[in-house]
Design a protein with these regions (language model features):
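Thiol/selenol-based redox catalytic cores and closely related redox-interacting motifs
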Residues: 89-179
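Extracytoplasmic thiol/disulfide redox context detector
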Residues: 2-5, 10-90, 131-154, 172-199
Length: 199
C-alpha cells in the first residue's frame, strides 16, 4: 500500500511539472471557482459566515500551517474557511489528508494536525493512514488537479469572491496586512511570534 501511495504522490509531482502553473483567464477562473465550491473540504469557522475563503493545503506544508494559525483570528469574527486538502509535498501527504477526511470529526482532526505540527520535520501532527479508502485518494487527487488548474505551483493557495462577486486567487502565504482585504473583514491583531515576519 505504501508503494501505491508513493506512486500517487509521484504522479502529482509529474502532473505539476507538466501543467507548469498556467494562469487561467478570468472566465476560466469563474468556472474553476464553481468546481471549488463543490470540492471535498473541511469546513471550519463561523456558522453564520460574514465571509468565505477556500484554501488548498497539504497537511505537511509549513506555510499552510502558518496560514491556518493566522486565519484563526478571522474565524472568530465571521470567517468561514473551506480547507481543501491536496497531497504533493511528501509520500505520506496522501495518508495525512485521508486521516483528516476520514475522521469522524473533520474539523477537530484538522485542528489536531495544525496544533501538533512539527516544524522541524515539516510534518503534520496527525498520524497518516496507511490504507486510505480509494474514494478518499480520488478526492485528494481531484483537489490537487483543481489547484493546479487554478495555476498554483504549490500550497497554500487561496481563492475567494469579493463583494462584487469577482473571483480572486493567491498562491502562497499572504502577508498579515493582506488578510483584511482578502477576507473583507476588519483587520485583526495577531501577536503570534511565528507570524511576525509575515506582517
Amino acid at each position: 500500500m505504501k508503494t501505491f501511495v508513493s506512486a500517487v504522490v509521484l504522479g502529482f509531482f509529474l502532473f505539476s511539472a507538466a501543467v507548469h502553473a498556467a494562469t487561467p483567464s478570468a472566465q476560466e477562473r469563474e468556472a474553476l471557482f464553481s468546481e471549488l465550491e463543490k470540492a471535498e473540504a473541511i469546513v471550519e469557522g463561523a456558522r453564520e459566515a460574514r465571509s468565505t475563503l477556500y484554501v488548498f493545503f497539504d497537511a505537511n506544508c509549513l506555510y499552510c500551517n502558518l496560514t491556518w494559525r493566522a486565519l484563526q483570528h478571522y474565524e472568530k469574527v465571521g470567517l468561514r474557511v473551506h480547507w481543501v486538502p491536496v497531497a504533493y509535498q511528501k509520500p505520506d501527504s496522501v495518508g495525512r489528508a485521508a486521516a483528516i477526511l476520514e475522521a469522524r470529526y473533520r474539523a477537530a482532526a484538522l485542528k489536531y494536525n495544525a496544533v501538533k505540527y512539527d516544524a522541524a520535520k515539516y510534518e503534520g501532527g496527525i498520524q497518516p493512514l496507511e490504507k486510505p479508502k480509494a474514494e478518499t485518494i480520488e478526492k485528494v487527487q481531484a483537489n490537487t488537479r483543481l489547484m493546479q488548474r487554478f495555476g498554483a505551483p504549490g500550497t497554500p493557495a487561496l481563492a475567494w469572491k469579493d463583494k462584487e462577486g469577482q473571483v480572486h486567487f493567491k498562491a502562497g502565504l499572504p502577508r498579515l496586512s493582506e488578510l483584511a482585504g482578502i477576507t473583507g473583514l476588519p483587520e485583526q491583531k495577531i501577536d503570534d511570534p511565528e507570524l511576525a515576519r509575515f506582517r
